[in-house]
Each structure stands twice: as structure tokens, then as C-alpha cells.
Amino acid sequence: MVQKAHSFRRKTRKKLRKHPRRRGLPPLTRFLQEFEVGQRVHIVIEPSYHKGMPDPRFHGRTGTVVGKRGDAYIVEVPDGNKVKTLFIHPVHLRPQK
């Protein structure tokens, strides 16, 4: 009998898909983005870069930058009645306008 996969990227067939013209890595400016503490950011996963990638359930969520650890930013995201703390690489973040 087969077992269901419990991998990190399961159920993300459409969520982590890129448009064919956008294939490959994004521009370097996305890697070198700077955010300030208290700034609101959107979590938009970049599927071609795996380091510092948050769980796909947080794709599309908005959080607040709390600090920095190495290259990654510490982002707090409300999840129901709790506030989750995530360590996310800046390539997976976009500033809120």
C-alpha cells in the first residue's frame, strides 16, 4: 500500500509555480533588499531559491519585521489566535506599499 507524501512542498503544485518567462533566479536587487524593524512585509515565496523559504502555508500572508538574523529577517505573522515567528530570506519578502 502506498503512503501519502509529507514533504515540505506537498500540495503546492500551483502555489509554487513560476510563469515560463520568469524562470530562473530573480534579479540581485531582490536578494539585497533591506527592511527596517517594524516594517510590514508580504510573504511571496520565490520557488527557485530554497534557502530561508518559509512554509508554503504562509505564502501570501503579511507580517511585521522584528529583527535580523544573518541574511534572514525575523518576521512575526498572526496565525489564528497565535503570532508565529518566521526566519525568512529577503528574496521571499516584498515591502507593503
UniProtKB/Swiss-Prot annotation:
Listed A to Z, the keywords are: Ribonucleoprotein, Ribosomal protein
Question: Where is the region Disordered?
Answer: 1-25
PROSITE patterns, per the entry: RIBOSOMAL_L21E
Q: Name one Pfam family in it.
A: Ribosomal_L21e
What does the record list as GO biological process? translation
Give Gene Ontology CC terms.
Answer: ribonucleoprotein complex; ribosome
- HAMAP family attached to this UniProt entry: Ribosomal_eL21
The protein here is known as Large ribosomal subunit protein eL21
- Which organism is this protein's natural source? Pyrococcus abyssi (strain GE5 / Orsay)
Q: Which gene encodes it?
A: rpl21e
